[in-house]
């Protein structure tokens, strides 16, 4: 794929990491509040925290992606002095929109399950996302030397993780509702 694509991927990952470190704060807040509400037995307050955290995570992550897509030469020009990289990155910068959106939601959902002390759910969801989402497409990306497939694999990993954790939330909510009906 070449050194230019390697440099472009490095720059795109810098934006992704900047967004993720920022959104991780929302995940930590979610973790703390969910854990506190669970400990106090105030389970009815957990879902509003989750919804609010997801919205705020997206509000934080999307500007990173949108600004990078709309002004790639300016944004990436701040990160590198190699003009050819700043000008050719436009082919891959669009991947930041789905990747950062999915990552924001996944980080918040991880915070939710950490707050509930459900480490097994996190582990199983991450392994599922790795095996079913990331690995097959990443292997194809390596085999075909396709950078778009590599970005697809990372995006699908986050989508699979988010979907898997979301299914567990629905299951938890059904269990919670049925326990309310029994009391």
Model-flagged regions — what are they?
Residues 1-5:
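Short extramembrane helix-to-coil loop segments that connect adjacent transmembrane helices in Major
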Residues 8-66, 70, 106-117, 121:
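Small-residue-rich hydrophobic transmembrane alpha-helices
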Residues 10-17, 53-54, 93-96, 126-130, ...:
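Transmembrane helix-bundle signature of multi-pass membrane transporters/permeases
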Residues 17-19, 83-109, 135:
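Alpha-helical transmembrane segments of multi-pass membrane proteins
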Residues 24-27, 96-115, 121-133, 148-166:
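Short runs within selected transmembrane alpha-helices of multi-pass transporters and secretion channels
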Residues 34-99, 140-183:
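Short alpha-helical transmembrane segments in multi-pass integral membrane proteins
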Residues 133-141:
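Hydrophobic alpha-helical transmembrane segments in multi-pass integral membrane proteins
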């Amino acid at each position: 794929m070449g050194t230019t694509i390697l440099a472009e991927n490095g720059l795109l990952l810098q934006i992704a990491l900047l967004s993720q470190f920022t959104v991780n704060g929302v995940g930590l807040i979610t973790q703390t509040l969910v854990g506190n509400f669970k400990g106090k037995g105030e389970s009815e307050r957990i879902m509003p925290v989750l919804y609010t955290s997801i919205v705020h995570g997206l509000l934080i992550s999307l500007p990173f992606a949108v600004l990078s897509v709309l002004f790639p030469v300016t944004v990436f020009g701040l990160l590198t002095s190699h003009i050819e990289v700043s000008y050719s990155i436009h082919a891959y910068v669009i991947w930041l929109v789905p990747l950062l959106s999915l990552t924001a939601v996944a980080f918040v959902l991880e915070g939710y399950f950490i707050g509930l002390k459900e480490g097994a759910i996190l582990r199983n969801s991450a392994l599922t996302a790795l095996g079913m989402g990331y690995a097959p497409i990443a292997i194809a990306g390596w085999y075909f030397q396709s950078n778009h497939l590599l970005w697809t694999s990372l995006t699908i990993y986050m989508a699979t993780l988010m979907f898997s954790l979301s299914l567990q939330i629905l299951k938890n909510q059904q269990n919670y509702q049925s326990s309310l009906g029994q009391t």
